Amino acid sequence: MPTAPRTNRRRLANAATVIPLAIGLASAGLPGGQPASGPSDGLAIVQKGSFNPVCTLPFAGVRNPALDDRCGIQGGSSDPAKQAESRAKNNFCAAKQPPKNMFYQDLIDLQKQAEKEKVPKSLPDRGAVEKMGEGEYVSYVAMIKDAHYSDVAKGEAVNCNLPGEVTNDIHIVLMSDPTDPDECNSTTAEISPHFRPPSWTPANLNALKKPVRIRGHLFYDGSHTPCRGTSRPNPKRASLWEIHPVYSVEVCQKENRDPKGNLEQCRNTSRAEDWVPLDEVLSSERN
């Protein structure tokens, strides 16, 4: 799907640096649990001291004071490349059109393209990966192999290096083949701690045991390295292209004793009722 031209993004980002921070703080009084609203471009406002959504959140978020009151859209680094990376990781505003369906091979092909074009790890200007698709709103069906809080000891730049579970991402390991135990063949989704719904936890995600449909912002995470041959770096993955941040998690309701067959059925279904939001699944289980 089309994304905003690079020149427009640069113009918005440059303009943001001269807008008083007070504008970015205008929505600070939003009540917890209510979607926030504001300008339509998630990369347009530079926030240093707090995080305030600059568009309507794609989920019913709850303000997370431990992070949202202390860490803005561009994270905690002074490095322009890390700031640009953080702004991309914090883009909650990509859902302007129906999502593009992504498949495992698409993410592998994007990885090959990035390697062919020798995309550097440090990207002060993310135009090269935006041309490949970063910034698109995408939909991906897979099985969750593992979900856990990441970087809890020291935090990471996008979250202002704040340690702890409440201030860091949930890393989701996604398998295209539910019978494959090797995480080197996995792909990745990340749930941001900003305005994270309380029910979006590793425990709830790991308990699903059904195919999930994850939608969100397509992102190139050049700070890591994919598995290659005997090289198995952590976190293990087949592609640096991931969904980050996650906008929604839905659970497939189709039943099939064959895990592969069940996942394939869920990928191919066109019935809206076959997908139920995570919160509704958890609510029905409680009742």
Task: List where the protein language model places each region.
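N-terminal secretory signal peptides that target proteins for export/translocation
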Residues: 1-9
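Short, hydrophobic alpha-helical membrane anchors of single-pass surface/secreted proteins
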Residues: 11-14
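Bacterial N-terminal signal peptides
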Residues: 16-27
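Bacterial Sec-dependent signal peptides at the C-terminal "C-region" and cleavage site
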Residues: 25-37
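OB-fold and OB-like single-stranded nucleic-acid-recognition modules
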Residues: 36-287
